[in-house]
Regions:
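A domain-level signal for the structural core that forms small-molecule/cofactor-binding pockets
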Residues: 2-228
Length: 228
Protein backbone atom coordinates (compact mmCIF):
# COMPACT_ATOMS: atom_id res chain seq x y z
CA UNK A 1 0.00 0.00 0.00
CA UNK A 2 1.06 3.58 -0.61
CA UNK A 3 2.89 5.50 2.10
CA UNK A 4 0.75 8.60 1.47
CA UNK A 5 -2.85 7.60 2.17
CA UNK A 6 -5.77 9.90 1.49
CA UNK A 7 -7.99 10.46 4.51
CA UNK A 8 -11.73 10.60 3.93
CA UNK A 9 -13.28 13.11 6.31
CA UNK A 10 -15.23 11.92 9.30
CA UNK A 11 -18.24 13.87 10.49
CA UNK A 12 -17.79 15.94 13.61
CA UNK A 13 -20.39 18.01 15.42
CA UNK A 14 -17.84 20.81 15.88
CA UNK A 15 -17.36 21.17 12.13
CA UNK A 16 -20.90 20.76 10.87
CA UNK A 17 -24.19 22.57 11.22
CA UNK A 18 -27.19 20.50 12.23
CA UNK A 19 -28.53 20.75 8.66
CA UNK A 20 -25.26 19.28 7.35
CA UNK A 21 -25.43 16.38 9.79
CA UNK A 22 -29.05 15.62 8.92
CA UNK A 23 -28.09 15.70 5.23
CA UNK A 24 -25.55 12.95 6.05
CA UNK A 25 -28.40 10.74 7.27
CA UNK A 26 -30.81 11.72 4.49
CA UNK A 27 -29.56 9.97 1.39
CA UNK A 28 -31.85 8.07 -0.93
CA UNK A 29 -32.46 5.60 1.91
CA UNK A 30 -32.74 8.13 4.70
CA UNK A 31 -32.90 7.33 8.39
CA UNK A 32 -36.09 9.00 9.73
CA UNK A 33 -34.91 11.67 12.15
CA UNK A 34 -36.64 14.70 13.59
CA UNK A 35 -35.10 18.17 13.26
CA UNK A 36 -33.78 18.23 16.86
CA UNK A 37 -32.13 14.81 16.70
CA UNK A 38 -28.65 16.11 17.55
CA UNK A 39 -29.39 18.70 20.22
CA UNK A 40 -28.81 16.39 23.18
CA UNK A 41 -25.39 15.04 24.11
CA UNK A 42 -25.01 11.26 24.59
CA UNK A 43 -25.02 11.73 28.38
CA UNK A 44 -28.21 13.79 28.20
CA UNK A 45 -29.84 11.12 26.06
CA UNK A 46 -28.85 8.43 28.55
CA UNK A 47 -30.36 10.39 31.43
CA UNK A 48 -33.62 11.00 29.59
CA UNK A 49 -33.99 7.43 28.27
CA UNK A 50 -33.32 5.99 31.75
CA UNK A 51 -36.10 8.15 33.18
CA UNK A 52 -38.57 7.07 30.51
CA UNK A 53 -37.60 3.41 30.82
CA UNK A 54 -38.17 3.53 34.58
CA UNK A 55 -41.70 4.66 33.83
CA UNK A 56 -42.18 1.84 31.31
CA UNK A 57 -41.08 -0.80 33.83
CA UNK A 58 -43.22 0.76 36.57
CA UNK A 59 -46.25 0.77 34.24
CA UNK A 60 -45.65 -2.91 33.49
CA UNK A 61 -45.82 -3.58 37.22
CA UNK A 62 -42.14 -4.09 38.00
CA UNK A 63 -40.77 -3.15 41.43
CA UNK A 64 -37.87 -0.79 40.72
CA UNK A 65 -36.59 -1.12 44.29
CA UNK A 66 -35.76 -4.77 43.63
CA UNK A 67 -32.02 -5.37 43.66
CA UNK A 68 -32.11 -7.21 40.32
CA UNK A 69 -33.75 -4.47 38.25
CA UNK A 70 -33.18 -1.20 40.09
CA UNK A 71 -30.33 -0.30 37.72
CA UNK A 72 -31.96 -1.75 34.61
CA UNK A 73 -33.25 1.60 33.26
CA UNK A 74 -29.74 3.07 33.32
CA UNK A 75 -28.20 -0.08 31.86
CA UNK A 76 -30.70 -0.07 29.00
CA UNK A 77 -30.18 3.64 28.36
CA UNK A 78 -26.39 3.22 28.17
CA UNK A 79 -26.78 0.20 25.90
CA UNK A 80 -29.12 2.08 23.55
CA UNK A 81 -26.93 5.17 23.21
CA UNK A 82 -23.43 3.64 23.34
CA UNK A 83 -24.00 0.28 21.65
CA UNK A 84 -27.33 -0.71 20.10
CA UNK A 85 -28.03 2.67 18.47
CA UNK A 86 -24.53 4.16 18.31
CA UNK A 87 -24.96 4.52 14.55
CA UNK A 88 -27.27 7.47 15.25
CA UNK A 89 -24.30 9.51 16.50
CA UNK A 90 -22.32 10.99 13.57
CA UNK A 91 -19.04 11.01 15.52
CA UNK A 92 -19.18 7.21 15.52
CA UNK A 93 -18.95 7.04 11.74
CA UNK A 94 -15.80 5.04 10.85
CA UNK A 95 -12.80 7.08 9.79
CA UNK A 96 -11.85 5.80 6.34
CA UNK A 97 -8.37 6.05 4.83
CA UNK A 98 -7.88 5.43 1.12
CA UNK A 99 -4.68 3.87 -0.20
CA UNK A 100 -3.35 3.71 -3.73
CA UNK A 101 -3.94 0.33 -5.36
CA UNK A 102 -0.20 -0.24 -5.90
CA UNK A 103 -0.70 -3.84 -7.02
CA UNK A 104 -3.11 -2.64 -9.71
CA UNK A 105 -5.53 -5.36 -8.67
CA UNK A 106 -8.41 -4.95 -11.11
CA UNK A 107 -10.65 -7.89 -10.27
CA UNK A 108 -13.55 -8.10 -7.90
CA UNK A 109 -12.80 -7.82 -4.18
CA UNK A 110 -15.28 -9.65 -1.97
CA UNK A 111 -15.66 -9.47 1.80
CA UNK A 112 -18.25 -12.04 2.85
CA UNK A 113 -19.99 -13.17 6.02
CA UNK A 114 -19.67 -9.82 7.81
CA UNK A 115 -21.64 -10.03 11.05
CA UNK A 116 -24.78 -7.89 11.15
CA UNK A 117 -26.44 -6.93 14.43
CA UNK A 118 -29.26 -4.44 14.00
CA UNK A 119 -32.67 -3.59 15.45
CA UNK A 120 -36.05 -3.73 13.74
CA UNK A 121 -37.51 -0.23 13.93
CA UNK A 122 -41.07 -1.61 14.04
CA UNK A 123 -40.78 -3.64 17.25
CA UNK A 124 -37.28 -2.75 18.54
CA UNK A 125 -36.13 -6.37 18.60
CA UNK A 126 -32.90 -7.75 17.09
CA UNK A 127 -32.02 -8.42 13.48
CA UNK A 128 -28.97 -10.65 13.07
CA UNK A 129 -27.29 -12.11 10.04
CA UNK A 130 -24.49 -11.72 7.52
CA UNK A 131 -23.56 -9.09 4.94
CA UNK A 132 -21.56 -9.83 1.80
CA UNK A 133 -20.00 -6.88 -0.02
CA UNK A 134 -17.89 -6.49 -3.14
CA UNK A 135 -16.36 -3.74 -5.24
CA UNK A 136 -14.03 -3.04 -8.13
CA UNK A 137 -11.23 -0.58 -7.37
CA UNK A 138 -10.91 2.57 -9.47
CA UNK A 139 -7.38 3.15 -8.21
CA UNK A 140 -7.98 3.34 -4.46
CA UNK A 141 -8.52 0.70 -1.78
CA UNK A 142 -9.39 0.76 1.92
CA UNK A 143 -8.50 -1.54 4.79
CA UNK A 144 -10.68 -4.64 4.79
CA UNK A 145 -11.83 -4.05 8.36
CA UNK A 146 -13.32 -0.72 7.26
CA UNK A 147 -15.94 -2.62 5.26
CA UNK A 148 -16.93 -4.43 8.47
CA UNK A 149 -17.00 -1.14 10.37
CA UNK A 150 -19.24 0.52 7.78
CA UNK A 151 -21.69 -2.38 7.97
CA UNK A 152 -21.69 -2.18 11.77
CA UNK A 153 -22.15 1.61 11.83
CA UNK A 154 -25.26 1.55 9.66
CA UNK A 155 -26.58 -1.54 11.45
CA UNK A 156 -26.42 0.14 14.85
CA UNK A 157 -29.64 2.12 14.55
CA UNK A 158 -33.34 1.30 14.22
CA UNK A 159 -33.53 -0.23 10.76
CA UNK A 160 -35.41 -1.99 8.03
CA UNK A 161 -33.21 -4.38 6.09
CA UNK A 162 -33.89 -2.79 2.70
CA UNK A 163 -32.66 0.60 3.91
CA UNK A 164 -29.63 -0.91 5.62
CA UNK A 165 -28.60 -2.63 2.39
CA UNK A 166 -28.78 0.60 0.38
CA UNK A 167 -27.03 2.65 3.08
CA UNK A 168 -24.10 0.23 3.22
CA UNK A 169 -23.79 0.26 -0.56
CA UNK A 170 -23.89 4.06 -0.68
CA UNK A 171 -21.26 4.31 2.07
CA UNK A 172 -18.88 1.98 0.21
CA UNK A 173 -19.36 3.95 -3.01
CA UNK A 174 -18.48 7.15 -1.17
CA UNK A 175 -15.48 5.64 0.63
CA UNK A 176 -13.97 4.23 -2.58
CA UNK A 177 -15.14 6.74 -5.19
CA UNK A 178 -16.61 3.93 -7.25
CA UNK A 179 -20.06 2.95 -8.45
CA UNK A 180 -19.06 -0.70 -8.89
CA UNK A 181 -20.47 -2.03 -5.61
CA UNK A 182 -22.59 -5.01 -4.55
CA UNK A 183 -24.17 -5.69 -1.16
CA UNK A 184 -26.22 -8.72 -0.10
CA UNK A 185 -27.62 -9.13 3.41
CA UNK A 186 -29.13 -12.38 4.71
CA UNK A 187 -30.68 -11.87 8.14
CA UNK A 188 -33.05 -13.30 10.73
CA UNK A 189 -35.65 -10.99 12.26
CA UNK A 190 -36.68 -11.63 15.84
CA UNK A 191 -39.95 -9.80 15.19
CA UNK A 192 -40.79 -12.79 12.97
CA UNK A 193 -39.18 -15.47 15.18
CA UNK A 194 -40.35 -14.39 18.65
CA UNK A 195 -43.81 -12.93 18.00
CA UNK A 196 -46.61 -13.03 15.46
CA UNK A 197 -46.04 -16.02 13.19
CA UNK A 198 -43.08 -17.20 15.36
CA UNK A 199 -41.15 -18.65 12.45
CA UNK A 200 -37.61 -19.38 13.65
CA UNK A 201 -36.41 -20.83 10.34
CA UNK A 202 -36.99 -18.10 7.76
CA UNK A 203 -34.50 -15.42 6.80
CA UNK A 204 -34.73 -12.29 4.67
CA UNK A 205 -32.34 -11.61 1.79
CA UNK A 206 -31.86 -8.14 0.28
CA UNK A 207 -29.45 -6.99 -2.42
CA UNK A 208 -28.19 -3.77 -3.97
CA UNK A 209 -26.17 -3.81 -7.21
CA UNK A 210 -24.68 -0.94 -9.17
CA UNK A 211 -22.09 -0.28 -11.86
CA UNK A 212 -20.40 -3.42 -13.16
CA UNK A 213 -22.61 -5.58 -10.95
CA UNK A 214 -25.61 -4.76 -13.14
CA UNK A 215 -23.97 -7.08 -15.66
CA UNK A 216 -25.52 -10.56 -15.17
CA UNK A 217 -22.20 -12.38 -15.56
CA UNK A 218 -20.45 -10.17 -13.00
CA UNK A 219 -23.34 -10.54 -10.60
CA UNK A 220 -23.28 -14.32 -11.08
CA UNK A 221 -19.56 -14.41 -10.25
CA UNK A 222 -20.18 -12.43 -7.05
CA UNK A 223 -23.02 -14.72 -5.97
CA UNK A 224 -20.85 -17.78 -6.61
CA UNK A 225 -18.15 -16.30 -4.37
CA UNK A 226 -20.52 -15.74 -1.45
CA UNK A 227 -22.12 -19.18 -1.81
CA UNK A 228 -18.80 -21.03 -1.83
Amino acid sequence: MSSSPLKVSKLNHDDLLVDDIIHHFNGIAKTPLHSNAFQLSPDQKIEKIASHFSEILHTLGMDLTDESIKDTPLRVAKMYVNETFKGLIPENEPSITQFTNDYRYSQMLVEKSITVFSTCEHHLVPIHGKAHVAYFSTGKVIGLSKLNRLVDYYSRRPQVQERLTIQVADAIKKALNTNDVAVVIDAHHMCVASRGIRDINSSTVTAEYSGKFLNPETRKEFLEFIRS
